[in-house]
Amino acid sequence: MSRTQIIDGRDENGNTDLMRAALNGQSGTVKALLLGGADVNARNHEGRTALMFAIVNLHTSTVQTLLDFGADVNVQASCGCTPLLLAAGSGDIGITRALLNSGADPETICRPGITALVVAIERGYSAIVELLKRPLAQAVQGKPKSFRSNLQSATRTAALAATK
């Protein structure tokens, strides 16, 4: 058995030691496992990664460590969720910003009609909404007017749904 196989050993749910350390915010353990060869992008049976576990529990320093080691910011779990969707849904602007700075795609559709922006609007996280709208506004420049109108309409619909 190789050293990597030992480090990336899995439990009955497909979780690795790296995922468990990320879930618990154990940044030192996360870094040691990564330096020892753990797969930063290993996925469990639900398609979740250590980065997703760290985000869900708002472990900012663990998130940054995983990003520093090349964690995939655009990976989608089996349910369709992405690290950015989880961060936007948590209301944590620091983690959301770190993901965007690392190349997370704010346009990824996680489930029909659901993006990180829609989740932030629905939950009333206005600072995250503004943060997510910036890259979208840049992407929309030069697109046909119909595309821009559809984006504006979707944003209004999500905002109205959030007020109900």
Question: Residue ranges of each PLM-predicted region?
Answer:
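Alpha-helical adaptor scaffolds
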Residues: 45-48, 52-64, 68-69, 74, ...
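Ankyrin repeat structural motif
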Residues: 26-34, 59-67, 92-100, 126-133
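Ankyrin-repeat-protein effector appendages
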Residues: 2-9, 102, 111-114, 119-164
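Ankyrin repeat A-helix N-terminal signature
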Residues: 20-25, 53-59, 86-92, 119-125
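Ankyrin-repeat helical core positions
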Residues: 1-2, 22, 34-35, 55, ...
